[in-house]
Amino acid sequence: MDKIIEKILTFSDPYIALDERVVIKKNEIIVDGNHFPYTKPAIIAVGKASYKMAKFFIDKLKDVKGLVILPKGSYISLPKVEVIESTHPDISELSFKAGTEVIKFLKNEDYDLLIFLLSGGASALMEYSNVPYEILRDINEKLVKSGLSVNEINIVRKHLSLIKGGKLTEFSKAPILTLIVSDVPGGDLSAVGSGPTLPDSSTVDDAKLILNKVGLGEYSKYLIETKKEVHNSFNFLILDINIVLRKLRDIVQNPIILSSEIRGDAYSFGQNLAGIVNTSFSNLGLKPPYTLLAGGEPDVKIEGKAGKGGRNGEVCLGFLKWVKRNSNHRFKLYAIATDGIDGNSEYAGCIVDENTIVDNIEYYIYSHSSYEALEKVGRVIKTGYTFTNVNNVYVLEVT
């Protein structure tokens, strides 16, 4: 495996991150110098990183019980705990079943410390609500199609749930140690999985305004308030894109971190990276060798039918379309989704360099078929499911 890809996956690994930050002793867990005593610990792990996060504690704790909720299709057994498959990104009956099992566990089991392991995807994987499933599904479908931002959609979702927006804490009979692997650009931890154990600053009135804005005011009657203060959960960020980029900075040549919050059109981001390479000598004062690092979640706007593609594939095609090749420099661009899946493909991302030539590139750009093109030239990255997600990582080496 290519060294850069290997390092990205290693630096994104929740098990390794936990091992660096968490000390487990016979009767206490220590996180960044904070001590959490226990005699009967329990685990609830939910999200794309739940398997590796749970495995760390299962390996380290002699006696532990709990639930681990994974995306459907990524099932893998674990000792000592029950593993539940649910759906992502859509809420389904499996989401409600998972949420119900979590509440039953919290109410009925005997534990004196709840270790809550949270990562991206949890919002869909686990739900518990007074709103009937069919109605909640209808609301979610309409929200997704409404043109609202992800933040606006999540505000509404929190106010329709009995466990999002800090409300899961109401069901725990013991202190909660929340450890978080974040996929949210910008660092808002309450947005990870809709923050089941974190306080939320948004209000019912905020959610009403959002629903009215897109003609869904009829659903306002289902809104409930989120928790503004949480006193029984202690929350720690264990891993995110900024941590990964800082570690990459230590191993590459002359690193420059562009941003950890890349958003907007994926193709345009690739075009912008090409522009940096094209003008680095005259405009930016950059001289090879240097390495540009970035992370985030650019998007792809689909109109009509699309082929096999994803945001990272589009970044690579945008870059290849516009980068100027000459004998003065060489380049290599890595674009990888740390969860192992980019778009509707089986690939995590792609690697392209000055020798990568895609014939008829405009066709693949406009048909959103980036991986059909990149497969043909052997520039795809296939990792399989990685059991983590800190979003997308971009590394551009210029030599």
Swiss-Prot record:
Reactions it catalyzes: (R)-glycerate + ATP = (2R)-2-phosphoglycerate + ADP + H(+)
Positions of substrate binding: 48
Thermal properties of activity per the entry: Optimum temperature is 90 degrees Celsius. It exhibits more than half of the maximum activity at temperatures ranging from 70 to 100 degrees Celsius.
Cysteines joined through disulfide linkages: none
Entry superkingdom: Archaea
Details of cofactor binding: Magnesium. It could be replaced to some extent by nickel, manganese, cobalt, calcium, zinc or strontium.
GO MF assignments: ATP binding; glycerate 2-kinase activity; glycerate kinase activity
Keyword Transport among record annotations: no
Stated pH dependence: Optimum pH is 4.5. More than 70% of the optimum activity remains at pH between 3 and 7.
GO cellular component entries: cytoplasm
EC number: 2.7.1.165
Keywords per UniProt: ATP-binding, Kinase, Nucleotide-binding, Transferase
Cofactor(s) recorded in Swiss-Prot or TrEMBL: Mg(2+); Ni(2+); Mn(2+); Co(2+)
InterPro entries: GK-like_C_sf (IPR037035), GK_N_sf (IPR038614), Glycerate_kinase-1 (IPR053656), MOFRL (IPR007835), MOFRL_assoc_dom (IPR025286), MOFRL_protein (IPR039760)
UniProt xrefs under NCBIfam families: GlyK_Thmprot
Protein family membership: Belongs to the glycerate kinase type-1 family.
Role, per record: Catalyzes the ATP-dependent phosphorylation of D-glycerate to 2-phosphoglycerate. It can also utilize GTP, CTP, UTP, ADP, AMP or pyrophosphate as phosphate donor.
Subunit structure: Homodimer.
Protein name, entry field: Glycerate 2-kinase
Organism: Sulfurisphaera tokodaii (strain DSM 16993 / JCM 10545 / NBRC 100140 / 7)
